[in-house]
């Protein structure tokens, strides 16, 4: 005759949080063992691609990991992918370049105008 099994916890429905597998103990009994939920891989905040170098765990398991395993040692390490960080840095650089170019252009225009005024006054 087959041994009957009962859940060890109060939840009696077959939900994802109540997933079990049958295991035979050293004493020969069959018991339910609870399986934890599988974690999701963290994703990039901008483009949504999976972040490389960070394990897929449940949120409460990340607190037990050392910081070197939780993040990547780079700017925006655990939240943005390398491609998005590169784009952000390049964009910031180009914006700064544009600002300085604008200032230089204004100065050149001002100098040119002053030279014209000097020539016309003579």
UniProtKB/Swiss-Prot annotation:
Please give one Pfam family short name. Answer: Ribosomal_L34e
Question: Where on the tree of life does the source sit, at the highest rank?
Answer: Eukaryota
Q: Does the keyword Transmembrane helix apply?
A: no
The record's Gene3D superfamilies line, in alphabetical order, gives: 6.20.340.10, 6.20.370.70
- State any GO BP term from the record: ribosome biogenesis
Record key words, sorted: Ribonucleoprotein, Ribosomal protein
Does the UniProt entry include the keyword Ribonucleoprotein? yes
The molecular function terms of the Gene Ontology recorded here are: structural constituent of ribosome
For this protein, the record's InterPro entries field holds:
Ribosomal_eL34 (IPR008195), Ribosomal_eL34_C_sf (IPR038562)
Query: What family does the Swiss-Prot or TrEMBL record give for this protein?
Result: Belongs to the eukaryotic ribosomal protein eL34 family.
Protein's name in the database: Large ribosomal subunit protein eL34
Q: Gene encoding it?
A: rpl34
